[in-house]
Amino acid sequence: MAGKENNFPPLPHFLPLKPCFYQDFSDEIPVEHQVLVKRIYRLWMFYCTTLGVNLVACLAWWIAGGAGANFGLAMLWLVLFTPCSYVCWFRPAYKAFRADSSFNFMAFFFIFGAQFVLTVIQAIGFSGWGACGWLATIGFFGTSVGAAVVMLIPAIMFSLSAVVMAITIVKVHRIYRGAGGSLQKAQTEWSAGTWRNPPSREAQFNSFSGNSLPEYPTVPSYSTSGSQWP
């Protein structure tokens, strides 16, 4: 955003890379939605942590006799979904609440819904998906109890992520419908191109109100020289 230096992700100063986004909940998100947006952010962090724990569990699975492909896929999920989930569903949610953007709400519902389905699949734990879910964990207890106990941790974390994602979708949808959001508004934003970087609500208000009145209204003055009452 103009006049604001990007601050996320926070990177060490010695790296040649610079932060890609500006993120400040107290500055950009309306007070009534700050708690919810922060919870969505924490959900993203929890899901990324789950992917990291899943990678360790898949390594234990592999060492105990499981397929090495699961470890490879777990590494791919961690590297791929950590940045993509932030860009593809957290940022739309952030921009949606920042500017009451119907297009970003729609993008959030679509992508976050797909993320929810994927997380449910990861929690179930189908063989060959690179996720230590319930089926993979329970089935491996007969082979290695120690590895299965490690695998149980991401199974629980994937399940918690899926539950919180479902609750989040319901809460965000209620707010969206209550604020009068619609597909027509999303199409209008798409046509105008404002979906890319919608202005904050404060900026929209300032643009709408403008300088309609001078800071100090002037009172008309009338010359009294030569004027007499009859």
UniProtKB/Swiss-Prot annotation:
One of its GO terms (biological process) is reproductive behavior. InterPro entries: SCAMP. Residues 1-39, 170-230 are cytoplasmic. It is found in: Membrane. Keywords: Membrane, Phosphoprotein, Protein transport, Transmembrane, Transmembrane helix, Transport. One of its GO terms (cellular component) is trans-Golgi network membrane. It is a multi-pass membrane protein. The keyword Amino-acid biosynthesis does not apply. The chain crosses the membrane at residues 40-60, 61-81, 106-126, 149-169. The keyword Membrane applies. It holds the Pfam family SCAMP. The modification Phosphothreonine is found at residue 194. Residues 197-230 are annotated as: Disordered. Residues 203-212, 220-230 have a biased composition (Polar residues). Belongs to the SCAMP family. Probably involved in membrane protein trafficking. This is Secretory carrier-associated membrane protein 4. It comes from Rattus norvegicus.
